[in-house]
Amino acid sequence: MKNIAVTVDNLCIKYRGLKKTSIRASWSRLRDKVEVFEALKNVSFELEEGKILGIIGKNGSGKSTMLKAIAGVFSPDSGTIDLHNNSISLLSIGVGFNRKLTGKENIYLSGMLLGFDEEQIKEKEKEIIDFADIGDFINRPVKTYSSGMYSKLAFAITAILETDIMLIDEVLSVGDAKFKEKSYNKMKELITDDKRTVIIVSHNLTTIKNLCDEVLWLNDGEVIEIGKPEVIIPKYEKFMNE
């Protein structure tokens, strides 16, 4: 019997912001009202150890919010997330790097945040740098990087410093064609480990179909359906084309 790697139970996350008021209301000194947006609404699922879950949905459906909640970046307003004592890493553009530090310094910072000690990171440093393949930029501040270079380094760190659970947000589609192929092949290599659990967010349905064991379809923060890619993806495509 497989162990459970991730349990999400009735997860709700809300964003709060100031609602815009009219000029007349401003002149009347009426208070701005707080507008609440429900990003995730009572989301529940379990993912077995070693399984690959793809999350699909239109823009704004809550996919990235889901990953950040599982990673601990966002706290639930209600509901629970249980990682069952597994280590976890989030690979997402704009998350995790100190932009003032060099790429090499960020390798160590990211590694330590993932729970690795300096010696363990040192052993993997050359492999990470070679995989990222960003040349002399590895010694320059991350703030000088293009989005493609950022993605290459982020993917290299997450893929080489292997955690129990990997969360991947759209980065398989970033970078030049050569790196896309390299990262895709690395993902296929990683998921052959029946102990590693992966959750992928992507608009590339071919990637989801080829890599994932199951697909979770989100729409406006709610789970529409969870099932096999060959069942869920045709339904989603029909929905998007209506």
Model region roles, listed by residue range:
Residues 220-221, 236:
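Conserved ABC ATPase "signature" C-loop
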Residues 202-203:
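H-loop/switch region of ABC-family ATPase nucleotide-binding domains
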Residues 208-210:
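A short, surface-exposed alpha-helical micro-motif characterized by mixed small hydrophobic
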Residues 56-58:
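The feature captures the beta-strand-to-loop junction immediately N-terminal to the Walker
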